Amino acid sequence: RLPCPFSWPVRIANLKRCLLVTRIPIDGSEQELVLVNLHLEAYDDGEGKEAQTAMLLQILQEEYAKGNYVIAGGDFNQSFPDGTDRYPIASGADWTPGTLGDLPAGWRYAWDSAAPTCRLLNQPYSAGSSGTQFYVIDGFILSPNVEPVSVRTQDAEFAVTDHNPVVLEARLVS
């Protein structure tokens, strides 16, 4: 369970953020592919996202130190470095994501801004509408022994959710 930035009684009504860790054995090796699914805090003042990101990075580094391959992915509720170039945050936006910080040496972010990964739910979806805010806040963190082959946002035009799926193809390297 990730740190909760809200005090009682507000924390009762807020989502409890957590990580889902999946371990996949690597044939002929003691190493594992460790996949971490995440959904970090959205509606805090920024402290919660920072604390949750710090805890996430600590867990990822511990797994990498064991010799594992590590991929974390999901809704960071934070923009990737240079991730607002294609979808800039409008002045006075109803919601503004934080910005992810630098990673330890060798680690990398993987994201795709060809289509937005998220949208504000202030109005019904209309492709190309200037009346809503689009974001790129979903993606991945890769350990130094994982190379991205491709990252692709599937533009589902927000048919069933306020997010579009993001697909990563990666290669494990020694």
Regions found by a protein language model. Name each.
Residues 1-32, 40:
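Structured beta-strand-rich core segments of catalytic domains in phosphoester-bond hydrolases
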Residues 38-40, 74-76, 164:
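Active-site metal-binding loops of divalent metal-dependent hydrolases
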Residues 145-156:
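Low-complexity, intrinsically disordered Gly/Pro/Thr-rich segments
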Residues 34, 44-147:
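Metal-dependent phosphoesterases centered on the DNase I-like endonuclease/exonuclease/phosphatase
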